[in-house]
């Protein structure tokens, strides 16, 4: 059986790596990367971290479409599907790549699997929420990470194609040893720090909110911020890049194993990332999530993850 995996972002590479760890000789795997995260430092670090040979991946030409352009991605993916002729397509998560992959499979009459199906934040204005709903409607098999996800699909009358398979990123987490970042000086860890990531459009496109988030980060003694290309571009665009509080240390995005090391050795995490919420939860780190709601309800119910969406605020009080 020929399986085609369609991915395009860092979190999707992590999910893909988990699936590829369970390779079977019965399956032939092909990979297409849409280049939705187009920075070499972001993509190649992760592929190399998981031992995935870059020569086995078909990278779409990101010059032919905007990173947010589902229609152009769909057209390019449809061309690739006609050449590869897979028996089934695997799509992952909740990005524009997810929707483009699901749509191209559907309109080319190829069965598809949505991994991480059934997750819901119930924030209808959130792009990722729309992507999840569309993908679950389009795909033939819905692989759910939690019982809550299955329950969500039951409410939408989609449970007839839902399967509770567990969280595949937990497999990767358990099998990845945190590694001390190779490009960071040894004295970096002499002082305590909080870890933060910001990349969601609802936070980046609200300029006053973004400025207030940075102001709130200044209430912490020291913050390490791996800077996503979209955040850097936005900060430059709105003239905030040169005014970042001095207690915030910007670093390049890291491979997954090194990111786990940063989380493990931090005082706490402030993020809008779904994946980082879970990694922090598994590493038992106090977490503040910059959202109105989260699809990972279990982290909230545990009391370890707290939603925070009004800024500025004294984050020391929130972490305590």
Regions found by a protein language model. Name each.
Residues 2, 87-88, 193, 267-268:
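Structural motif
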Residues 4-7, 13-22, 26, 46, ...:
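Active-site and donor-binding regions of nucleotide-sugar-utilizing enzymes
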Residues 24-55:
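N-terminal glycine-rich anion-binding loop in soluble enzyme alpha/beta folds
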Residues 36-39, 44-47, 179-265:
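Donor-nucleotide binding loops and adjacent catalytic segments primarily
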Residues 37-41, 60, 138-204, 209:
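A nucleotide-sugar donor-handling region in carbohydrate enzymes
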Residues 47, 148, 306-320:
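Leloir-type glycosyltransferase catalytic cores
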Residues 57-60, 144, 164, 249-252, ...:
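Short acidic-hydrophobic, aromatic-tinged amphipathic segments that line or gate anion-handling sites
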Residues 91-92, 114-115, 142, 260-299:
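A donor-sugar binding/catalytic signature common to diverse glycosyltransferases
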